[in-house]
Amino acid sequence: MSDIFNMGSATQVEQQQTEKAQGVKSLEDHINSIHLQWNKEIQKLNDMLKTIPDTIELENIIFAKIQDVVDYYHTWLNRMAALNHKYNQRYAAEYNNIKMNAQIRYSTEAAVRMQIEANMADLIYERDLYNQHAEYVKETIDTLDGIRFAIKNRIELEKLMTGVEFK
């Protein structure tokens, strides 16, 4: 798999997740670095569309990159599922704690829900980061597909401009 999507070993990931105060910041840094690296990678692939010899090589590169991103996306979705499981467990625990042990009586379920969300703000923020990054990865796949389809158009344009047939 590409170095861009090096997510670390399972132990490294678990270690990162246990460091709560620094965990979200590390996640933000990890996501931001992946975004920056992919921005550079997409620009490099776009630049390869400028010349025909590079365009021919580009097709093979694009297929490999798409597979890397799809594999990464699948891994990321698995992590999101684990995070959602953790969220649901914690939400249930918070709900039970408020309903059974709280000294405060909440007038509505909406008030209870707001209190739970306030108590779980860190986990909600982490889920939001995961969701935003998943959307970014999906858009990256679409961009790579767009470049792949641009290859054919680039070759056709070159044929029109030069009158040369490529085989």
Label every model-predicted segment.
Residues E57-E94:
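Short, well-structured hydrophobic secondary-structure segments
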Residues Q37-D71:
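Short, charge-rich amphipathic alpha-helices with coiled-coil/heptad character
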Residues H85-Y95, I124-L157:
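Long amphipathic alpha-helical coiled-coil segments
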Residues K40-Q43, D71, N78, H85, ...:
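Generic structural signal for well-ordered, non-membrane alpha-helices
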Residues E158-K167:
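Acidic, low-complexity, intrinsically disordered peripheral segments
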Residues S26, H30, I61, K65-D68, ...:
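Non-transmembrane, amphipathic alpha-helical segments
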Residues M1-H30, K167:
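Glycine- and charge-rich intrinsically disordered segments
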Residues A81-D128:
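Extended, amphipathic alpha-helical coiled-coil scaffold segments used for oligomerization/tethering
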